[in-house]
UniProtKB/Swiss-Prot annotation:
Molecular function as annotated in GO: rRNA binding; structural constituent of ribosome
Chain residue ranges for the region called Disordered: 45-78
Entry GO terms, CC: ribonucleoprotein complex; ribosome
Species assigned in the record: Pediococcus pentosaceus (strain ATCC 25745 / CCUG 21536 / LMG 10740 / 183-1w)
Its biological purpose: One of the primary rRNA binding proteins, this protein initially binds near the 5'-end of the 23S rRNA. It is important during the early stages of 50S assembly. It makes multiple contacts with different domains of the 23S rRNA in the assembled 50S subunit and ribosome. Forms part of the polypeptide exit tunnel.
UniProt xrefs under InterPro entries: Ribosomal_uL4, Ribosomal_uL4-like, Ribosomal_uL4_dom_sf
Organism domain of life: Bacteria
Short name of one Pfam family: Ribosomal_L4
Protein name: Large ribosomal subunit protein uL4
Length: 207
């Protein structure tokens, strides 16, 4: 088991929290992480690229000249691919780039990046974020108290609406719920900030 410091939102230490070594203490597998990132980024592609083939280009319904007797090559349409202004052959069409890797690989990739955050001392565990009124200024102050001044991924429990409202206008903070935690967001953040309740939910899901 690995231990990390548990902080209050004012930055003071509130003891230690024990992490599940099977989730936060494994040897990171970079190959599996790479596969997970490529899969996520592929799923994010819009895939709306399209060109017009000869049937979609406007015009070209009439045969440009008769089949025989002109001495020229036979042509059936001025929208054939060899003509200027003609259709495109084998061009890109709308498609989905999404694919999936095995569930065990996805879980291993997630455990790997979580373990890497612990190794990098970039995991910040907070007992709770609690605000009487959801003000961005107050949340920014809390992050400052926790020495979180760069890009941060904030993992909050589902029912913490005041913290979500207070943090959503911060440009360097992305908020996810425990079930939405993913490899790409963790890798794109400098610090992973998670509440104690959300940490328990993540460990329960990955156990």
């Amino acid at each position: 088991m690995a231990n990390v410091s548990l902080f209050k939102q004012d930055g003071t230490k509130n003891g230690d929290v024990e992490l599940n070594a099977d989730i936060f203490g494994i040897e990171p597998n970079n190959d599996v992480v790479f596969e997970a990132v490529v899969m996520q980024r592929a799923s994010m592609r819009q895939g709306t690229h399209a060109v017009k083939n000869r049937s979609a280009v406007r015009g070209g319904g009439r045969k440009p000249w008769r089949q025989k007797g002109t001495g020229r090559a036979r042509q059936g349409s001025i929208r054939s691919p060899q003509w200027r202004g003609g259709g495109i052959v084998f061009g890109p069409t709308p498609r989905s780039y999404a694919y999936s890797i095995p569930k065990k690989m996805r879980r291993l990739a997630l455990k790997s990046v979580l373990s890497q955050k612990v190794l990098d001392e970039s995991l910040v565990v907070v007992d709770e974020f609690k605000f009487e009124t959801p003000k961005t200024k107050d949340f920014a102050q809390s992050l400052g108290n926790l020495n979180v001044d760069k890009k941060a991924l904030l993992v909050l429990e589902e029912d913490n609406e005041s913290a979500v409202l207070a943090a959503r206008n911060l440009s360097n903070v992305k908020i996810v719920e425990p079930e939405g935690i993913n490899v790409l967001d963790i890798m794109n953040s400098d610090k992973l900030v998670i509440t104690q309740k959300a940490l328990s939910q993540v460990e329960e899901a990955l156990a």
